[in-house]
C-alpha cells in the first residue's frame, strides 16, 4: 500500500487510518481463530463453532499444508469456501512493492560480504535500492557488524555511522570497513541510553531492528526532527511493556482498538520460509516430543491443561523422546512411572503435531494482518510528527517474510 507522492499529508494519514480500522475490525471479528494457540489448546473454539471448516482442515494432506503455507492469499480463498468473511484477506493485506529495480547492483559483492550470510546480503541490497536516493548522512541503527552501513556507503554522499552496543561486533565491523575501504564508522552505543546523541542531519535506517529498538529509533528521529527514517521492523513482541502501546494519537484514541499482548504480537513474526530444511526437520521433531510430553503430563497430573516447559538444553536435540520426557518431567517436578510407555506418547505427540499443523494454518493467516495493524500505527505516528510516509515491501517474501518498509521524510514547511 504505497501512496502517490502528490497526495496531501491529510489524505495519506486518513488512508492509513481507514486501512488500520478495517484491519482492526476484521481481527476483532475473528479473535477465536488467532488468539488461542493450537499447541496449548487441542480443541480451539472455532473447531466447534465452524465444524465445516474444521472438517476441511482436518482432511488436508502434508503437501497441502506446505502449499497453503507458501500462499496465504490462496489459503484464505480456500478457507472462504467455509467462512466467506475470509474473502477480505487479499484486499486487507495487499501491499505494493517499493522500487527495487536496481537491487542487484546495490548489493555487496560476495567477495566483500565477509561474515555476511547470503540472505542478509541480498536483503540489505534490496533495502538499499528501495530507499534511493540518499540525501543525508546515514545512521545504521543497531548495526551489528555494519553490513547494511557498508552496503549503503557507496550510495551515500555523506557520512555513514553505525550504532551498536556489542563492542566485539563494533570492532569486527570497523576492521571489515577498513579492510575493504568502506567509508563507515561504527560506534559502541546503547541506543536505549537516556543521554543518546544523534548525529546531525541523520537519516536513520534499521533493517530488522527488534521491538523497543525500532520504536526508539522512530521516536528519537521524530523528537529531534531529523530529515528521514527508513525502518524494516521485526520482532514486535520484544518490548518491556506487557501489552502493545500504540504510538499514534489516532490509535490510542480509538475506542474499539485491539489490546494485544506480547504473546499475541509474537504471532506476527512466526514464519519459517527462510529456515533451512535441517532446521525445519529439527523443529518438527521437537514439536512432536513437546506435544507427546504434554499428553503424558495431562494424564499424570489428572489436569487437562497445558503445562509450559522452558527451552531445552541443546544436548537433548539429538537424543530421544524418553530422555526429553525425563528432563521435562524433572524440570516441572513430575515423577514418571517406571512403566511409562514412551512409544505410545511419542505417537500421541505425532498425531497432535499433525493436528496442530493444520489448526496453525488457519491461525497463521492472521500473521500479516497483525503485522500491518502495528506498522500502520507506526506510519500514522510518523505522519502526525510531520513526515511523509511511504509504506510498502522492499523484497519478496521468499527472501524474508519481514519485508515491510516504512520510509518517512520530514515535510518541508510549505507542504
Regions found by a protein language model. Name each.
Residues 118, 142-146:
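Class I SAM-dependent methyltransferase "Motif I" SAM/SAH-binding loop
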Residues 41-132:
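Conserved Class I S-adenosyl-L-methionine-dependent methyltransferase catalytic core
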Residues 159-164:
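Conserved SAM-binding motif I beta-strand of class I
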Residues 136-142:
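Conserved class I S-adenosyl-L-methionine
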Residues 145-157:
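Conserved SAM-binding loop of SAM-dependent methyltransferases across substrates and taxa
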Residues 2-52, 192, 198-415:
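Class I S-adenosyl-L-methionine
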Residues 173-174:
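Conserved SAM-binding loop
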Residues 181-191:
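Conserved SAM-binding strand-loop segment of SAM-dependent methyltransferases
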Amino acid at each position: 500500500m504505497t501512496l502517490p507522492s502528490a497526495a496531501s499529508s491529510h489524505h495519506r494519514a486518513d488512508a492509513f487510518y481507514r486501512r488500520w480500522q478495517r484491519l482492526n475490525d476484521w481481527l476483532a471479528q475473528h479473535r477465536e481463530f488467532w488468539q488461542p494457540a493450537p499447541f496449548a489448546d487441542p480443541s480451539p473454539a472455532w473447531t466447534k463453532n465452524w465444524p465445516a471448516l474444521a472438517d476441511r482442515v482436518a482432511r488436508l494432506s502434508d503437501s497441502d499444508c506446505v502449499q497453503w503455507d507458501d500462499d496465504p492469499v490462496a489459503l484464505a480463498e480456500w478457507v472462504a469456501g467455509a467462512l466467506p468473511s475470509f474473502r477480505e484477506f487479499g484486499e486487507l493485506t495487499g501491499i505494493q512493492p517499493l522500487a527495487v529495480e536496481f537491487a542487484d547492483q546495490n548489493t555487496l559483492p560476495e567477495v566483500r560480504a565477509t561474515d555476511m550470510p547470503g540472505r542478509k546480503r541480498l536483503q540489505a541490497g534490496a533495502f538499499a535500492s528501495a530507499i534511493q536516493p540518499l540525501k543525508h548522512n546515514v545512521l545504521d541503527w543497531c548495526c551489528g557488524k555494519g553490513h547494511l552501513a557498508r552496503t549503503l556507503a557507496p550510495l551515500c554522499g555523506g557520512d555513514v555511522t553505525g550504532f551498536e552496543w556489542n563492542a566485539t561486533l563494533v570492532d569486527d565491523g570497523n576492521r571489515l570497513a577498513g579492510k575493504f575501504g568502506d567509508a563507515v564508522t561504527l560506534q559502541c552505543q546503547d541506543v536505549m541510553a537516556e543521554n543518546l546523541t544523534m548525529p546531525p542531519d541523520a537519516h536513520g535506517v534499521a533493517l530488522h531492528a527488534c521491538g523497543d529498538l525500532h520504536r526508539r529509533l522512530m521516536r528519537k528521529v521524530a523528537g529531534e526532527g531529523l530529515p528521514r527514517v527508513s525502518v524494516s521492523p521485526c520482532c514486535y513482541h520484544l518490548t518491556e511493556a506487557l501489552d502493545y502501546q500504540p504510538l499514534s494519537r489516532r490509535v490510542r484514541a480509538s475506542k474499539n482498538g485491539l489490546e494485544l499482548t506480547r504473546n499475541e504480537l509474537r504471532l506476527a513474526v512466526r514464519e519459517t520460509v527462510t529456515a533451512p530444511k535441517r532446521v525445519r526437520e529439527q523443529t518438527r521433531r521437537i514439536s512432536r516430543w513437546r506435544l507427546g510430553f504434554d499428553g503424558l503430563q495431562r494424564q499424570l497430573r489428572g489436569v487437562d491443561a497445558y503445562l509450559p516447559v522452558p527451552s531445552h538444553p541443546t544436548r537433548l536435540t539429538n537424543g530421544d523422546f524418553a530422555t526429553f520426557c525425563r528432563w521435562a518431567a524433572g524440570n516441572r517436578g513430575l515423577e514418571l512411572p517406571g512403566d511409562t510407555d514412551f512409544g505410545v506418547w511419542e505417537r500421541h505427540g505425532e498425531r497432535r503435531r499433525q493436528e496442530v499443523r493444520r489448526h496453525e494454518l488457519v491461525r497463521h493467516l492472521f500473521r500479516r494482518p497483525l503485522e500491518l495493524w502495528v506498522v500502520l500505527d507506526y506510519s500514522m505516528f510518523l505522519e502526525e510528527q510531520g513526515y511523509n510516509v511511504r509504506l510498502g515491501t522492499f523484497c519478496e517474501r521468499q527472501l524474508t517474510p519481514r519485508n515491510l518498509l516504512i520510509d518517512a521524510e520530514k515535510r518541508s514547511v510549505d507542504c
